[in-house]
UniProtKB/Swiss-Prot annotation:
Pfam families: RadC, UPF0758_N. One of its GO terms (biological process) is proteolysis. The keyword Hydrolase applies. Keywords: Hydrolase, Metal-binding, Metalloprotease, Protease, Zinc. Residues 103-225 form the MPN domain. It comes from Variovorax paradoxus (strain S110). A motif (JAMM motif) lies at residues 174-187. Zn(2+) binds at H174, H176, D187. Belongs to the UPF0758 family. This is UPF0758 protein Vapar_4033.
Length: 225
């Protein structure tokens, strides 16, 4: 059925006005943001295709503007920019709520926080969560970009930043834009090098988390620390 042929009570905007946003399905809310479909695909169908392709709202939150191009109807810069802006606001809101919990006391909380911040980056980044003695977040810093090796991640810089923030512990992290989250031997070697360097200033390495869009890997959970 063409969107214009839907009865008024079934159209997302009218439904939201009459019954509130909570009454709408994910695809209906997304359709309100997209506003229009394309030839052969109404806006509700386009919204549902986006959700199906990226694995629901959680997967959509990890997408980039480049990822959206694979969906017919999302080729225009304006539509992609509007959706990416809304997704970024959602990520920031979720990150604020996670930070308000203050204590990063479980791998699950850490992985969720890092997914929101670096999981969808199209390039590789190395970031560090600097924590106090109660494992409360002091700051997340992205320290290096590009292919990460022992020669591109400098232990001295990580140690310097830990001293600057007076951190008691850290969580190391980086992303794999390729999608694979298995650590390489270089990842494991780098972790041990940084762990040894930070131990000299009594800073504990609690974990090294690898993330990609929709996936994460904790070295601590796997017994690699």
């Amino acid at each position: 059925m063409a969107f214009k042929d839907l009865p008024a009570h079934a159209r997302p905007r009218e439904k939201l006005i009459a019954r509130g946003a909570a009454a709408l399905a994910d695809a209906e809310l997304l359709a309100l943001l997209l506003r229009t479909g394309v030839a052969g695909k109404n806006v509700l169908q386009l919204a549902q295709e986006l959700l199906d392709h990226f694995g629901g709202l959680s997967g959509l939150l990890q997408t980039s503007a480049e990822d959206l191009k694979v969906i017919k109807g999302m080729g225009g810069d304006a539509k992609r920019a509007e959706l990416i802006a809304v997704l970024e606001l959602a990520r920031r809101a979720m990150a604020e709520r996670l930070k308000e919990r203050t204590v990063f006391d479980s791998p699950g909380t850490v992985k969720q926080y890092l997914q929101l911040h670096i999981g969808s980056r199209p390039y590789e980044v190395f970031a560090v969560l600097f924590l106090d003695a109660q494992h409360r977040l002091i700051v997340l810093e992205e320290l290096f970009r590009g292919t990460l090796t022992q020669t591109s991640v400098y232990p001295r810089e990580v140690v310097t930043r830990a001293l600057h923030h007076q951190a008691a512990a850290v969580v190391l992290s980086h992303n794999h834009p390729s999608g694979s989250i298995e650590p390489s031997r270089a990842d494991e070697s780098l972790t041990q090098t940084l762990r040894a360097a930070l131990s000299l200033i009594d800073v504990r390495v609690l974990d090294h988390v690898i993330v990609s869009a929709g996936q994460s890997y904790s070295m601590a959970e796997k017994g690699l620390l």
